[in-house]
Amino acid sequence: MKSPDKHEKIIRAAVKVFAKKGFFSARISDIAKAAKVADGTIYLYFNNKFDILISVFDEEIGKFISQTKKLVDQEESPQKKIEVFALKHLSMAKENKSLAEIIQMELRQSHKLIKEYRKTIFSEYVDIISAIIRQGQEKDIFRKDVKPGVAKRAFFGALDEMTRLWVLSPKPPYDIEDTAKQISNMFLQGINAG
């Protein structure tokens, strides 16, 4: 019988193993060892290594998106929502470096994963930004000539580059809160109305 606890244990172990070894170098036996389960147990829950990676994205990133939406929705001001989004995004690199490493490295290397997730989870995540921009435009806070699709990618790109820097650095070179504020302020200066 499948156990939700064992499933979660395997996912957590996979995040660590994929971050340490990379998806292509990791083996099912590495994940089983890290999860303290038999190799065969993995196959009760997942068809193969790629299935585990997909589950990591579905479950772990799904949780992160839900948390981000919840935090953003607690704010009234579109400007504050942008700041909250930036801080939550950058905080992931500090709070869950292994997951941040997987997002930074594996999402870019696996063409199959990119095809599947560019259209779903990734879009859902960056669409939070475009929804904030549209809300600000409706309230005449943000310029009407700003295209939300372009702006969301520019903002995400700045955050993504800082996350990549932190993932590749042994020690974060900048303070996360200060960086989130600085990126948010630069972005908001570009899209604020009048």
Q: Residue spans of the language-model regions?
A:
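C-terminal peripheral helix-coil segments that are non-catalytic and often amphipathic
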Residues: 84, 88-91, 127, 131-139, ...
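Hydrophobic alpha-helical connector segments
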Residues: 55, 70-95, 148-155, 177
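Alpha-helical DNA-contacting segments of helix-turn-helix folds
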Residues: 53-60
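Short hydrophobic/aromatic patch on the recognition helix
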Residues: 36-46
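Short, hydrophobic secondary-structure boundary micro-motifs
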Residues: 101-103, 116, 144-145, 175
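Basic, helix-initiating cap at the start of DNA-binding domains
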Residues: 1-21, 26-34, 51
